[in-house]
Amino acid sequence: MDYFVVIIGITIFVPMHTFYCREINNDIALLDESESKHLSQVLRLNEGDIVKIIDGLGMEWEGIVQQLNKKKTQIRLTNILRKESIAPLCSIAICPTKNIDRFEYFLEKATEIGICNIYPILTKRSERKAINIERLDKIILNATKQSGNLFLPILHPLISFKDFFEEIDLASFTFKAMGHCVENKLRKSLNSTYKSGQNALFLVGPEGDFTDDEIDKAIIEGFESVVLGDSRLRVETAGIVACAQINFLNFKI
């Protein structure tokens, strides 16, 4: 919970800042260097201040800053605030856009809505061949903390379209679909094909769309061809819409 402080009859809302922690032992959380610097040097919190801690796996605690250190700050966890056992049932394989700002926008919004895995893929018509994973991970982490979500999405390494089908465990997904603009391929609406509770994997192609061979390959691998509406969508918009529709059908938004 956050706090209200009353000063001379005036009530002031004081939100608790959220920090992500991988290293939690019993009731002690040790923040890494990046989160420690943010706590002490950016937010200028002090020992005794109350914060929120998330582990990215569905848990959120209230804690007290116990030992300040710019490389490893110690937080004593006082009580559990929230606990969720089911991660978002949405994963998206998507081609990074030529303009990286648009891809970063997708990552931010999909994280806010709720997403489990993001697989950047390279197709024949891809215009961007490399991404900065470290920078993109920071965008995802910030969006996770800002949105209040308890699950930190996993951004996987960039992978070719061919290797994607060979290396990803597609059997772990109970619903697989792809969006494309090829009108002579049979397509159904996502709303009519997806059923609540299915673990979904959605494929989004590049600005120039998937090739016919890529579409055929995906269909052979069990992907359904779907449409997301009547409009022709940008890559990042298609990813966000697919994510939103799947979460909506699972009553998450």
Role assignments for model-derived ranges:
Residues 22-23, 33-34, 56, 96, ...:
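Fold-independent oxyanion-binding glycine-rich loops
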Residues 51, 75, 152-157, 225:
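Generic structural signal for residues in well-ordered beta-strands
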Residues 95, 129, 207, 231, ...:
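Glycine- and other small-residue-rich loops at beta-strand/loop junctions that grip anionic moieties
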Residues 176-217, 223-230:
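Active-site/ligand-binding-proximal alpha/beta "capping" segment
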